[in-house]
Amino acid sequence: MSKRDYYEVLGVARGASDEELKKAYRRCAMKYHPDRNPGDAAAEATFKECKEAYEVLSDGNKRRAYDAHGHAAFEHGMGGGGGGPGGPDMGDIFGDIFGNIFGGGAAGPRAARRGADVGYVLELDLEEAVAGIERRIEIPTLIECEPCHGSGSEDGKVEVCATCHGRGQVRIQRGIFAMQQSCPHCDGRGTLIQNPCKTCHGAGRVEEDKVLSIKVPAGVDTGDRIRLAGEGEAGPAGTPPGDLYVEVRVREHAIFQRDGDDLHCEVPIRISQAALGDTVRVATLGGEAEIRIPAETQTGKLFRLRGKGVRSVRSRSEGDLYCRVVVETPVNLTTDQRELLKQFEATFTGEDARKHSPKSATFIDGVKGFWDRMTS
């Protein structure tokens, strides 16, 4: 099967500039890369075709050979071999393209080396999360070795790796393609230590429990994260440290349930309070408040107390407190109380009962209608 013209593969004119070639290759790579098309053999083949075309056209010598002789320039060894030092750095190109797509960065020497990020879960009571708090925490981490100041060397001297010349990576040739990998001689550090530090044994870092004070802002909720820049693991060979991410988890509360910036709770009331109406006191996170219960209140009725919820950590507005009334059946009744209830119940007869208990009457009518339909 004959190969397609390289310019046609990338969709550019024969006089395309280097920048136009690079943009065309990026478009192709983003569309057909195997990571974005798992299991798609056709997409993978197109991606390889684009990669080969760009490898040739982005190299001045190879491009001139291709323009003069086409694909035959490489089939018969014309126009030079694989990409030398002047060829494109495919690792850098892929780092530019897919570092942004998948959240990573370039793996080449341009990538900034730093310490690893550290995660910590901080459990708080609801009151602490709502009001804000300063909490001391202790985390196991890697810190910079003090005797060698993170260099890993006992005398502070390090040598540039002769294999990678301090880049930390070496270039590997695979036919016309060039790849980069971590230098096996210096393990990607770019330097060598002849006299390792006796404290850290050349690592430049030591394990230690770090104690930190964290200021938790008012209004945080489960899942919120607090970033402490530079409080993660120390970087290798004196490079910058990572960050510490503190994830908040709020414990369940005995009274309140939280929904964003709003709070919910249940308020039990007696039958007499529900029937006759009353004013009841309820707890809020800021103290006590009053709810006026109107006469004939039923279980499930919601009362809204504006501004008695949680102050938002983002907008600083305050949520509301929703109180759901639950009519409580009395227990442990005395003989006199039982007698009074019997006398009260005796007043509910005939149409009088339907008038005083409309929901019960509706339910009974519904059940009767159901059985009538079943037996008809």
UniProtKB/Swiss-Prot annotation:
GO molecular function: ATP binding; heat shock protein binding; unfolded protein binding; zinc ion binding
CXXCXGXG motif repeat copies, ranges: 145-152, 161-168, 183-190, 197-204
Keywords assigned by UniProt, alphabetized: Chaperone, Cytoplasm, DNA replication, Metal-binding, Repeat, Stress response, Zinc, Zinc-finger
Required cofactor names: Zn(2+)
Residues covered by the J domain: 5-70
Domain of life: Bacteria
Similarity comment: family membership: Belongs to the DnaJ family.
Subunit structure: Homodimer.
Domain notes: The J domain is necessary and sufficient to stimulate DnaK ATPase activity. Zinc center 1 plays an important role in the autonomous, DnaK-independent chaperone activity of DnaJ. Zinc center 2 is essential for interaction with DnaK and for DnaJ activity.
Entry protein name: Chaperone protein DnaJ
Source organism: Xanthomonas campestris pv. campestris (strain ATCC 33913 / DSM 3586 / NCPPB 528 / LMG 568 / P 25)
